Amino acid sequence: MIKLILSIILIICFIINSIESFKMITLTTGPPSDLGWNNMINLGRIGVTKAMDIEDSRLFVVSGRNDTYELLLPIIQNDDIDLVICSSLDHGDACKEIAAMYVNSTEIKTQFLVRGSGATTKNLIQFTYNYASVNYLSGMFAGLQTKTNKIGFISPGITAGASDCFVYAFWLGAKSVNPNIKFYYYNIGSYLDKDKTKGAAENLIDVYDCDVIGDTLDDFTASNVAISRGRYAIGTNGFPQRDVYGENVVYTYAYNWTKYFVPIASAVKNKIPPSKWYADFNKDNNLSLYDLSFGFQVSAETKFKIINQTKSFASYVRTLHPYFCNEYMEGYTQKYNLTRQPNTTNCITTTGFIGIDAPVGDMNYLGNYTIKFSKVEFQRSIQIGFSIVSGLLIGFVILMMIGIVKYQDTPSIRSASPSFLNLTLLGGVIIFIGIIVWVAPISTHQCNARFWLVTIGFSTLIGSLVVKNIRIWLIFDNPELKIRTITNNQLYPWVGLCLVINIVLMSIITTVGDLKAIEAQGIDSLGKFEYMTICKMNYTGAATLYSILAYFGTLLLVGVFVSWKIRIVHIEEFSECTAIAKTLYSISFCLFVIVPLMISPQDKQSETIILCVTGIFITTGALLIFFLPKFWRIFGNEKQGSHEHFTQRKQSAVASARAESANRNNSSNSFGFSKSSAQIGNTISGIESLNDDSNESSLSNETK
């Protein structure tokens, strides 16, 4: 007996396992969270899954023929799917193509449910629903509810494969109950484009004063805009919006796809041949596709008119509905060559109705809504701020240049070479001008000018400081204190070389580097429809720019090294090396701080601010460190026109030590000569004339 029971159980299990489970796929164009078409399709999927106890019910979000085809074909070939619900017109072409591939297949048993009223095949089911009737009703509600008598509408349009026949049905419904309405509508080219929908809805409200807006889109974006602007929101995308938004939505219709998906899926499971399915209002509410809902503030009269019209639609054939037969159709069908129903002059056929695309009657078509890209400008206040600061600093530097000329005969200025001092200040002026240009409105010329000015300015400033320091090093850094006459004319070519290197590298950036202004999107925190004008260069230009930075780095390293070498000079007027060293150290330190900031992610405005602040700080700091001590000595210590180091024969401790060492070494050289401390003092006191070419010969005679 036990063996018999076990055998029966095994047979039952075998039979159960041998029964193939029903597998279903549902395709939507958007996520179920859209509170619209896709959500209702998904609810229909869930309803049929529960009703038929389907274990394998999949949902895929996909749109477009190519993407749908690539997604669906491998699944059909490998997963033994029973039913594919292609919910959108977007899926139709791909689903029909795959169905045609396997129409006579003995292995692929998949049935495809597609939207349309075309012919069915062995594996192709057609379903359609009367979308015009519910749009006519929604239009009636809008016409009864509007206070401004201005109604707006948004539709995908012909570019999305949808004619505006349903827009016309909405308008006609509003016109039937309120002849005084003005009707405005946009196409947006898609069933689901939140940005365009939002922009079009805002335009209808702000520009055309529409207080009711309808749509034939997949989501609730248009009504969300209406709610945010304090207008009536109506749900015209098939989702029961009042369940979510409550009394902010005064009217909705909702699809109930479960009523149709269950019998269709059951027919597929029971291997009933495919057929056409049609959904609309029905005398039997259990077979009606649409469920209507009204807000509390909607009058009983309005509700009565709407509900009464639904009963009217269910009582006679669709081809006699008012959106098929009316006073506008005779002239419209003639004008646009659309077919009329036989033996009538004012009734359009279903095919002709689908072909309605141009405005009917006094409909106002506003065209395809396009989003205008907005340009994000650099903050004007920041531009003005940097320009004012740089302008004031230019004025300050010019005053220093005038002071250099006025006090050029004082020891502090004469010993430092007035022409080189002004050349250094000129570099600062060029940098400040470059910063003003840097924050100016961007263009290709501005992109090039700002790099040229800033780099030339830094080459002039840093080059002059480094070359001056090298001269001091060559003069003082010799144990025997031999006279070395190095004139300004001998130094200018070296500063010129610094500029030539800069000019050559910048020329490469300007020409080969393709430095230009471009309009960029998707950078920084720009919105989807915002753009910014930025400067852009190619790989060669970027590599050359790094070469310029390396060149400046090398120049700074040379300057720092020379400053360290001449740290022994303690004569105040000639110890420019101290000021120059401090300047170069400060610049180097700033660069070590700034470079990591620039490498880290920065938006363009922050990057510009960092660069400009750095440029102003480095340049101003360098000039103040270098020039303030000179003017301080002029006004504080040189009342007699000379400093004590110039009036007293006194040398530095290091110089004295070197002189004594030189005396000891030279005393054993019969062909040499020795220098007394007084002679060394004479040498140092005469150095001030090195910057005055006319005094060089007298200086040499004095020190020989």
Swiss-Prot record:
One of its GO terms (biological process) is G protein-coupled receptor signaling pathway. The keyword Phosphoprotein does not apply. Glycans are attached at residues 66, 104, 256, 286, 308, 337, 343, 368, 538. Residues 1-21 form the signal peptide. It is a multi-pass membrane protein. Residues 22-383, 441-455, 514-541, 600-608 are extracellular. Its main location: membrane. It comes from the Eukaryota. GO terms for molecular function: G protein-coupled receptor activity. The chain crosses the membrane at residues 384-404, 420-440, 456-476, 493-513, 542-562, 579-599, 609-629. GO terms for cellular component: plasma membrane. Residues 405-419, 477-492, 563-578, 630-704 are cytoplasmic. Keywords: G-protein coupled receptor, Glycoprotein, Membrane, Receptor, Signal, Transducer, Transmembrane, Transmembrane helix. In the N-terminal section; belongs to the BMP lipoprotein family. This is Metabotropic glutamate receptor-like protein K. It comes from Dictyostelium discoideum (Social amoeba).
